[in-house]
């Protein structure tokens, strides 16, 4: 077993994934409440995708020696990062090519049985417009930085998918 595979089978690797998602969520809340930047609907959806990555990391951390746990974590990671990248690219397109015919809604379209914007309004209620670009760092907008972040998550998954799926590490209940 290689060191890379051992790392993929450790809690540390899943902890890093979880920690990076927590850092992104903390940054989002900092932008919203300290810098007073209003999140749009697409931002809220991306925030939910980051929560999906966070949850996937927590799943992987529970028992990373078991193949099924690593597979479930990797599936959640892949779905969340892909969905987040799709949303970030759509938001970049909206900001770069504003159109009165292509706008985002004022309220998120969560399922009726899971109205997150009503349950957690301080985190999931959008208050901004998608076409606004209120913040840039090094000439790159927040939406473009999220493209970088979600792309990074997908590249990391591609690097780790083979070690994650290798089942050579048999756990022992007596260690």
Swiss-Prot record:
What is the topology of this protein in the membrane according to its UniProt annotation? Answer: Multi-pass membrane protein
Question: What GO molecular function annotations does the UniProt record carry, in alphabetical order?
Answer: electron transfer activity; protein-disulfide reductase activity
Q: Which domain of life is it from?
A: Bacteria
Which sequence ranges are marked TM in the entry?
Answer: 14-30, 49-64, 72-89, 145-163
Naming one, the record's GO cellular component terms include:
plasma membrane
Keyword flag tRNA-binding: no
Compartmental location: Cell inner membrane
Signal peptide start and end residues: none
Xref: Pfam families: DsbB
Main function: Required for disulfide bond formation in some periplasmic proteins. Acts by oxidizing the DsbA protein.
Protein family membership: Belongs to the DsbB family.
Name recorded for this polypeptide:
Disulfide bond formation protein B
Question: Which organism does this sequence originate in?
Answer: Shewanella sp. (strain ANA-3)
Name of encoding gene: dsbB
